[in-house]
Amino acid sequence: MNDKFSLLKRMRRLSGILVHPTSLPGKFGIGDLGPEAYRFVDFLQESGQHLWQTLPLGPTGGHNSPYQCFSSFAGQPLLISPELLKDEGLLTDADLSNVPHFSDEEVDFAAVGEYKEELFKKAFARFKELPEDNPLKSELALFCKSAHWLDDYAMFMAIKKSKGGAHWLEWEKKYRKPTKSQKAVIEREFEDEILYEKFLQWTFCRQWSQLKAYANERDILLIGDIPIFVSGDSADVWAEPRLFQVDSYGFPTVVAGVPPDYFSATGQLWGNPLYDWKYHKKTNYEWWMERFKTQFLLSDIVRIDHFRGLESYWEIPADSETALNGKWVDGPKDEFFEVLIKTFGEEPPIIAEDLGIITDDVRALRDKFGLPGMKILQFAFEDEDSNYLPYNQPYNCVCYTGTHDNDTTTGWYATASEKARDKVRRYMNTDASQVSWDFIRTCFGSPARFAIIPVQDLFCQGSDCRMNTPGKADGNWAYRMKKELLTSDVAKRLYDVTKLYGR
């Protein structure tokens, strides 16, 4: 990780774009790690950017949320590029000749999943036919040995698919809580399916590593994202229940959420199982350090989602219908970061997502370890002297126009109060006819060390292009950008703003 540190220290004021790979253009119904991802890196370079921030890269479940994945370690198979598989001889031109008609504006995850699964099974069949001395075979074998999480994940997914995707708590006991001897039987029962899941993960990791190397060669750093909590329906909880506060069956006894606030009278009940921090402490946070180790292979900088949960978190009884009955419970605090530093060295490249209910104790934890927090410009214009206004921002922070959880800037301005809109116009000295570019200029001109904009703001897109609306169960995460939007004119305009403000 020393190379990352030297690059970060050398580049004082950095800017970049937030876009999840699923949102990239491409003919297979979803953005992936193929040619369009490389084209996007080229766009970043042409426009003078040095950061590409993504959402978590894991395999998603029913609501397609990257924050509710089947594993904290695995990658999203839907991001695998069929074109790159063709380049390796695992797919043919004929395989890719009859692509269904997919929307270029939003992802139909079910249709894309069905189509890509068909392609991946063809690629897997060809892979198995390769001679044993083929380098790809030895690469997969090496990957399987080095990825400590892979056996459990592959078995979990093989069983899950055989059960029609049912939650693991609904499986028969021999699958739900297998003994060592039962696992050996399951390995034989699902031998081919387990190898297929390993093949997918190896392919994802190879394609991602190649893309990351391409970006890094161009002085572009990747910012990844670690959701603090994991999904209850995950290989993590299934394989390692002792890491979590769950009963002997596997049901959580307490769950995650946040207390009532201005936006929600009953708080938010997320439902994720909570960690057994006493057990983690006994193991010197080994599982967490492995999680960071995996993430640092995928990313140069890591954002910790809901950072405040490491200081203290809202614990809600599992049978509650709202978050009202919760209470604050201490997290691992300083000790967690002391172990992190001992493992990865001083000044680990981490961003603390410090939005929401943030106390002095949370700020003290963030500042003690020198972690940059987040400042969202859309939050800056309702109050007279908001901490989010650029003149109140410290150097050691990340300034965003908005994030994946916010409306686009154009959409936000259209629905903001007249008081906020008036302040925007006066603060930015603008008529707000292209308000997202006013926000981009203000963001890039801020004192913040890092300035990041969601890709939708580059194109002045409205609320219909929003990535996620918190609290809304369906219809999220589907946004895609059209190929023709990434023009040299947009790159030149962004480059000029970037250089004007010394980024």
Task: Name the predicted role of every residue range.
Residues 46, 175, 479, 496, ...:
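Domain-scale activation on soluble regions of proteins
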Residues 5-11, 20, 64-205, 230-452, ...:
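Alpha-amylase-like alpha-glycosidases and glucanotransferases acting on alpha-linked glucans and related
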Residues 16-41:
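N-terminal catalytic cores of NTP/NDP-binding nucleotidyl/phosphoryl-transfer enzymes
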Residues 10, 35-60, 298-299:
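Catalytic domains of carbohydrate-active enzymes, especially glycoside hydrolases
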Residues 197-230:
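Conserved, well-ordered alpha-helix/loop/beta-strand core segments that scaffold catalytic motifs
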